[in-house]
Amino acid sequence: MRCIHELADVFINDSDERILTQSLDATEIDKHADYESFFSINSDESIMKARPWKSNAKYFKKTYISSLALCKMSVHAKSGGAIEVMGMMTGKIIKNSIIVMDVYPLPVEGTETRVNAQAEGYEYMVQYLENSKQVGRDENIVGWYHSHPGYGCWLSGIDVATQSLNQNFQDPYLAIVIDPMKTEDQGKVEIGAFRTFPDNYKSPDSAAPTNNTRGVPPSKQKDFGVHSDKYYSLDIQIFKSNLDTEILNIISNKSWIGKLIKSVNTANHQEQNMIENVFKLINKLQKKEVNQLNRFEISFIKKFDLIFEDIISKKLMNDNRFYSTISQSSYDSFSGHGNSSSNDEMDDESDLDDRDKSSAPLDISDTGNDDVMSMESSVNVYTDKRGDDNDDDDDNDGYDKRPMYTNYRSRANLTKPRKSGSSPEEHVKLSNNVNKTITNISNHSKDIGLTELQDLIALKTKESIFLGK
């Protein structure tokens, strides 16, 4: 609602130079004046009977316009764009003044330079007044308003004829003109209030017609200033109630430029904050240390990385074959070529003698108590050679402890789940350790700004361990 910038208190004194339009600044209303009485008083009956405007052509010197009426006129004029619009005004008559309490638009045909009220417009006017009386609104019609989009507030020849006709039959009558385009450009309501003189009346302070027709449409230039001696302008005073003040504070566009600047500054500030947060996150990632994790968690992460490496390699190479080697020391320990003490130590650390050796998955259950497993030893796996009649190892019947140089699809796929010979309590402990570790890794990942990818890989790692996937 940019056309409603401010409602203001502007007094225009009589002078030799005719001032036909006013730019109203709207929140500067005279706070000391008692305008609340305008809502409760009725028209002055003594003035209505005496009709002093018949003997004094300039009896009415001021018009009071409510903030509601000004808003409605401005919005209506703005909605018409380059097309003229028209409406009626209702109000009251007091000494030397016309009070405009409310306005309503008329369904009329408008062009860029003219507006004509047809029969349906007059019918609408009568019905509106009847309905207003039924709801307790006793105001009568006190005038009409129309718009001049882009070419100022003044009365053309047709406007003068229309206003003179209405003043003869239903005086007091007022004409108001609003320029919505200038209102939008300057941020203040461009408005003028006028009354015409009687026929053959010569105003003593009438000004000569002006030749400045800038912005006036060609069809209106011949009328511009020609009829200026047939009407005069009234001072305009805006008034509002206490309740109107709160509403105007909401819809007022007094600081619309400031709001635009503020919105731009806010966007720039948000962008700067985002960039600063990115750099802070990078610094945090660079300085983050993993020494906060215990040995079990570090070992878990290493195994985690191995499985993730296999998955990514499979995706990149699009090949089911993956080659793996182990060190000679691991070969000796698994093939029995190393010393027995090494084998015994290996068995003690992994508790292989206490479990059924039908498979050997990636073991994370022992790493919570042992030292961190090396990357080399963590890739040792067993191959299932059941049914091999030539196997001489009675203690490990059906298995061949040899380093894997054979092709396989994935380490995780070759590691079958062990048939745990341990108690249910140990299995629960293993599960709890895994869940706790995954939770710690997830929290740690969030601390250093990682995405949900690591949580997903952790879940896949857990499935690989317990399901042998």
Curated annotation (Swiss-Prot):
Subcellular location: Cytoplasm; Nucleus
Protein name: COP9 signalosome complex subunit 5
GO term, biological process aspect, one: proteolysis
Organism, scientific name: Debaryomyces hansenii (strain ATCC 36239 / CBS 767 / BCRC 21394 / JCM 1990 / NBRC 0083 / IGC 2968) (Yeast)
Principal location: cytoplasm
Subunit structure comment from the entry: Component of the COP9 signalosome (CSN) complex.
Keyword NADP: no
Segments carrying motif JAMM motif: 146-159
Gene3D superfamilies tied to this protein: Cytidine Deaminase, domain 2
